[in-house]
């Protein structure tokens, strides 16, 4: 906190006083003031409600008919005027998240979602609702993944539920299936990988005729990773089968994303990294070749994903008893995880550290 404050020329209490404050905040004996909340939000990747243990639901306001009709009229014009701006803002937040991590984006993302939820609430006809709901579905999955990365699992789960509802409102099985597939990772991280597998398989059965080949490949790769997390001979076989299916489904078109599904980044290079991750979890010796190939071709702007590659290489070297190489990659994984503030990868780094 002191380093953060010094960099921004903020006046805060001494180190000794801060230790007392932190203890009292944790025990509920002292309220978090606005000044310290502004510092803690980007440091912890938490919302005001999470810091203060409050309900985020706003108090209803007693608005009259004039105000209601004004909001409805404003929302009716949004699909033509504001939706492109919503999409551009989501893309900017996605880029910032990919390169710098999610912890410093909590306020921006919450404000972004609130604006779209407000617009959707007062959009009446399907023609006005669908574009806003589509934008909200994509932004909500991004917000959910950011929350999961920050260790805010309750917020992550609720954001995925918001994304699914928005996708249903948008009549978009693509965004619905993607939200279900990502939500499965919350279950896996919570210790329910078998339930996660069932959810991602259900996502693949959600209007498959309307899913793009890239989305189908993404869901198959997610199933492979989650099956590997369950373990056991049957799930190992299922993981390998799902990997083969992902490889067969992924279009060889040189593209990374679909124009109508911008939430997914997946090409042959990304799938190679994913395959290496799954094979490392299965203890397969061929994981090493896949992972080093992925590392050589990795996009440096995918900072968090590169931390994952180094974690996977650590795991692969540990399986072969190559401790020096494992330590080298673990150190790189730790540096990248700290750079993005990823609680999720920091946790994985600590688990791997315990095996050295």
Question: Which stretches of residues belong to each language-model region?
Answer:
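Long, contiguous hydrophobic alpha-helical segments, chiefly transmembrane helices and signal peptides
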Residues: 1, 22-25, 40, 145-146, ...
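Short secondary-structure junction/hinge motifs that connect adjacent elements
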Residues: 1-3, 15-18, 109-111, 130-132
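Conserved binding/catalytic microenvironments
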Residues: 78, 83, 90-356
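Short acidic, glycine/proline-enriched loop segments that cap or flank alpha-helices
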Residues: 10-13, 300-302
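Short amphipathic recognition helices of helix-turn-helix/homeodomain-type DNA-binding modules
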Residues: 3, 11-77
């Amino acid at each position: 906190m002191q380093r953060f404050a010094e960099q921004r020329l903020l006046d805060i209490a001494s180190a000794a006083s801060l230790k007392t404050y932190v203890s009292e905040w944790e025990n509920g004996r002292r309220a978090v003031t606005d000044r310290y909340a502004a510092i803690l939000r980007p440091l912890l990747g938490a919302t005001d409600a999470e810091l203060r243990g409050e309900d985020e639901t706003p108090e209803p306001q007693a608005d009259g008919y004039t105000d209601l009709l004004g909001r409805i009229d404003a929302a009716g014009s949004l699909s033509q005027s504001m939706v492109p701006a919503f999409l551009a803002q989501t893309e900017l937040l996605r880029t910032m998240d990919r390169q710098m991590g999610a912890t410093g984006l909590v306020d921006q993302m919450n404000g972004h979602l609130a604006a779209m939820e407000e617009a959707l609430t007062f959009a009446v006809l399907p023609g006005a609702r669908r574009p806003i709901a589509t934008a909200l579905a994509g932004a909500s999955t991004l917000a959910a993944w950011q929350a999961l990365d920050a260790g805010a699992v309750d917020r992550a789960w609720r954001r995925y539920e918001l994304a699914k509802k928005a996708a249903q409102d948008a009549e978009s099985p693509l965004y619905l299936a993607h939200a279900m597939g990502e939500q499965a990772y919350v279950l896996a991280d919570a210790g329910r990988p078998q339930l996660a597998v069932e959810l991602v398989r259900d996502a693949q059965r959600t209007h498959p005729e309307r899913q793009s080949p890239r989305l189908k490949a993404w869901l198959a790769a997610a199933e492979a990773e989650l099956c590997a997390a369950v373990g056991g001979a049957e799930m190992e076989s299922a993981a390998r089968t799902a990997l083969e299916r992902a490889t067969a489904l992924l279009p060889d078109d040189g593209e990374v994303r679909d124009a109508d599904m911008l939430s997914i980044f997946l090409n042959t290079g990304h799938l190679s990294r994913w395959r290496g991750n799954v094979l490392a979890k299965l203890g397969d010796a061929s994981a090493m070749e896949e992972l080093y190939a992925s590392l050589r071709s990795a996009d440096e702007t995918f900072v968090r994903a590169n931390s994952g590659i180094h974690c996977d290489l650590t795991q692969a070297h540990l399986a072969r008893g190559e401790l020096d190489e494992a330590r080298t990659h673990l150190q790189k994984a730790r540096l990248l995880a700290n750079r993005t503030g990823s609680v999720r990868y920091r946790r994985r780094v600590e688990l791997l550290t315990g095996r050295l």
